[in-house]
């Protein structure tokens, strides 16, 4: 059977559900698919189908990330049901990176809880651009004033983590009512209202091809009589023959010119996001470029050594360390295509970091790397991964 062609008629956006355990993230995800299925915008998925991650059945905790897709009149969405449990913060640090926006689910009966706060903080740290709120289980609260109090509390919490708490749309409803097909005024109608706010409030992400050119260097060759060729996969933007590019990271920034782009042994006049290409550089010597640097549009990215990271440290069971680490720990940081040694300083009042913890770390690399906020990395010791992280803030 031929594969269905993916109709790319609508703009695409990646979103997810976040929030405290048992506040209704997975039920809401099911409710969205069921509601949109009525207009042909989704395949209805039951709670059990979304929650079907093998580890999770024993403890009722979603561990693995479930993926569903659906569309509204305006956009096509890929939706991840993010794990709510504190242990699974790692999905946010490593994977929920794929979120252009998120739906924060808060139970009206409980109000914000510790993981609500933690997920908002993580969304801020890992750079989720926008949040909308679904206040769930409103049928469990009789008092209108209580609902208003919870709403105020949620808005204040969002503001305290630098999200625009006053402006964020909050939809109040019951995901379960929508799933069970009852009380449309708090069920189905509210799901449609929520999706309208997601459509309107979560900005359309810029397409990789429209961003400034960047290509991590994987390999370097010299071709006699032609010069130096660097190969890699273009991460974003477009590089055209004749354009100036910069080589950033590890050593002082160098400027050069792209004199040729080659893909599958064919010469092209440009390479764009997603292409595996060889880029010919004018007047650059083989020894001037190395793996771990990036080619980029001049001025679009700068080299840095000091940054604040949000990191998750793997447990022993996940193949990580068996023991905690302390301040001045010196692992390797794997950025894009290379390892760089860095020194970790723990925050004041933090004695040590245990396997399974997530924490804010101050890092100083021994050589500069082309860096920007939201850049992901692995923490490694002797080639094995012991942690995952994201650049939350560049210091210098």
UniProtKB/Swiss-Prot annotation:
<dbReference type="InterPro" id="IPR033720">
    <property type="entry name" value="EFTU_2"/>
</dbReference>
<dbReference type="Pfam" id="PF03144">
    <property type="entry name" value="GTP_EFTU_D2"/>
</dbReference>
<feature type="binding site">
    <location>
        <position position="26"/>
    </location>
    <ligand>
        <name>Mg(2+)</name>
    </ligand>
</feature>
<dbReference type="GO" id="GO:0005829">
    <property type="term" value="C:cytosol"/>
</dbReference>
<comment type="similarity">
    <text>Belongs to the TRAFAC class translation factor GTPase superfamily. Classic translation factor GTPase family. EF-Tu/EF-1A subfamily.</text>
</comment>
<dbReference type="InterPro" id="IPR009001">
    <property type="entry name" value="Transl_elong_EF1A/Init_IF2_C"/>
</dbReference>
<dbReference type="InterPro" id="IPR041709">
    <property type="entry name" value="EF-Tu_GTP-bd"/>
</dbReference>
<feature type="region of interest" description="G4">
    <location>
        <begin position="136"/>
        <end position="139"/>
    </location>
</feature>
<feature type="binding site">
    <location>
        <begin position="19"/>
        <end position="26"/>
    </location>
    <ligand>
        <name>GTP</name>
    </ligand>
</feature>
<dbReference type="InterPro" id="IPR005225">
    <property type="entry name" value="Small_GTP-bd"/>
</dbReference>
<dbReference type="GO" id="GO:0005525">
    <property type="term" value="F:GTP binding"/>
</dbReference>
<feature type="binding site">
    <location>
        <begin position="136"/>
        <end position="139"/>
    </location>
    <ligand>
        <name>GTP</name>
    </ligand>
</feature>
<dbReference type="GO" id="GO:0003924">
    <property type="term" value="F:GTPase activity"/>
</dbReference>
<dbReference type="InterPro" id="IPR050055">
    <property type="entry name" value="EF-Tu_GTPase"/>
</dbReference>
<dbReference type="InterPro" id="IPR004161">
    <property type="entry name" value="EFTu-like_2"/>
</dbReference>
<feature type="region of interest" description="G3">
    <location>
        <begin position="81"/>
        <end position="84"/>
    </location>
</feature>
<feature type="binding site">
    <location>
        <begin position="81"/>
        <end position="85"/>
    </location>
    <ligand>
        <name>GTP</name>
    </ligand>
</feature>
<dbReference type="Pfam" id="PF03143">
    <property type="entry name" value="GTP_EFTU_D3"/>
</dbReference>
<dbReference type="GO" id="GO:0003746">
    <property type="term" value="F:translation elongation factor activity"/>
</dbReference>
<keyword id="KW-0963">Cytoplasm</keyword>
<keyword id="KW-0342">GTP-binding</keyword>
<comment type="subunit">
    <text>Monomer.</text>
</comment>
<feature type="region of interest" description="G2">
    <location>
        <begin position="60"/>
        <end position="64"/>
    </location>
</feature>
<keyword id="KW-0648">Protein biosynthesis</keyword>
<dbReference type="InterPro" id="IPR000795">
    <property type="entry name" value="T_Tr_GTP-bd_dom"/>
</dbReference>
<keyword id="KW-0479">Metal-binding</keyword>
<feature type="domain" description="tr-type G">
    <location>
        <begin position="10"/>
        <end position="206"/>
    </location>
</feature>
<dbReference type="InterPro" id="IPR031157">
    <property type="entry name" value="G_TR_CS"/>
</dbReference>
<dbReference type="GO" id="GO:0097216">
    <property type="term" value="F:guanosine tetraphosphate binding"/>
</dbReference>
<dbReference type="Pfam" id="PF00009">
    <property type="entry name" value="GTP_EFTU"/>
</dbReference>
<keyword id="KW-0460">Magnesium</keyword>
<dbReference type="InterPro" id="IPR004160">
    <property type="entry name" value="Transl_elong_EFTu/EF1A_C"/>
</dbReference>
<keyword id="KW-0251">Elongation factor</keyword>
<comment type="function">
    <text>GTP hydrolase that promotes the GTP-dependent binding of aminoacyl-tRNA to the A-site of ribosomes during protein biosynthesis.</text>
</comment>
<feature type="region of interest" description="G1">
    <location>
        <begin position="19"/>
        <end position="26"/>
    </location>
</feature>
<dbReference type="InterPro" id="IPR027417">
    <property type="entry name" value="P-loop_NTPase"/>
</dbReference>
<keyword id="KW-0547">Nucleotide-binding</keyword>
<protein>
    <recommendedName>
        <fullName>Elongation factor Tu</fullName>
        <ecNumber>3.6.5.3</ecNumber>
    </recommendedName>
</protein>
<dbReference type="InterPro" id="IPR009000">
    <property type="entry name" value="Transl_B-barrel_sf"/>
</dbReference>
<keyword id="KW-0378">Hydrolase</keyword>
<dbReference type="InterPro" id="IPR004541">
    <property type="entry name" value="Transl_elong_EFTu/EF1A_bac/org"/>
</dbReference>
<feature type="region of interest" description="G5">
    <location>
        <begin position="174"/>
        <end position="176"/>
    </location>
</feature>
């Amino acid at each position: 059977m031929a594969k269905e062609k993916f109709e790319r008629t609508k703009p695409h956006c990646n979103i997810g559900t976040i929030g405290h355990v048992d506040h209704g993230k997975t039920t809401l995800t099911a409710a969205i698919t069921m509601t949109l299925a009525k207009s042909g915008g989704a395949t209805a998925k039951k709670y059990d189908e979304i929650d079907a991650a093998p580890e999770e059945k024993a403890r009722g905790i979603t561990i693995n990330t479930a993926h569903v897709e659906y569309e509204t009149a305006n956009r096509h969405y890929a939706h991840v049901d993010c794990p709510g449990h504190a242990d699974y913060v790692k999905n946010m640090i490593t994977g929920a990176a794929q979120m252009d926006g998120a739906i924060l689910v808060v139970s009206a009966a409980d109000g914000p809880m510790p993981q609500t706060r933690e997920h908002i903080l993580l969304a801020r740290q890992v750079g989720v651009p926008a949040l909308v709120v679904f206040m769930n289980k409103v049928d469990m609260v009789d008092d209108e004033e209580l609902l208003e109090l919870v709403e105020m509390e949620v808005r204040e919490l969002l503001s305290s983590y630098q999200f625009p708490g006053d402006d964020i749309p909050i939809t109040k409803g019951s995901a379960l009512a929508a799933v069970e097909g009852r009380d449309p005024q708090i069920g189905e109608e509210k799901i449609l209202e929520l999706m309208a706010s997601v459509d309107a409030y979560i900005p359309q992400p810029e397409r990789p091809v429209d961003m400034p050119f960047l290509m991590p260097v994987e390999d370097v060759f010299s071709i006699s009589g032609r010069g130096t060729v660097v190969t890699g996969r273009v991460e974003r933007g477009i590089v055209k023959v004749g354009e100036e590019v910069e080589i950033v990271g590890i050593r002082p920034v160098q400027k050069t010119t792209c004199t040729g782009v080659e893909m599958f042994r064919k010469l092209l006049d440009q390479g764009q996001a997603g292409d595996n290409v060889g880029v010919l550089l004018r007047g650059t010597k083989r020894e001037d470029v190395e793996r771990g640097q990036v080619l980029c549009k001049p001025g679009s990215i700068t080299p840095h050594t000091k940054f604040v990271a949000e990191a998750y440290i793997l447990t022993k069971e996940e193949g990580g360390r068996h023991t905690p680490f302390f301040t001045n720990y010196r692992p390797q940081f794997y950025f894009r295509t290379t390892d760089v040694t860095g020194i970790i300083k723990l925050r004041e009042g933090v004695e040590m970091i245990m396997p399974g913890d997530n924490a804010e770390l101050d890092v100083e690399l021994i050589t500069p790397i082309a860096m920007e906020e939201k850049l992901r990395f692995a923490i490694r010791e002797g080639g094995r991964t012991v942690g995952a992280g994201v650049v939350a803030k560049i210091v210098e």
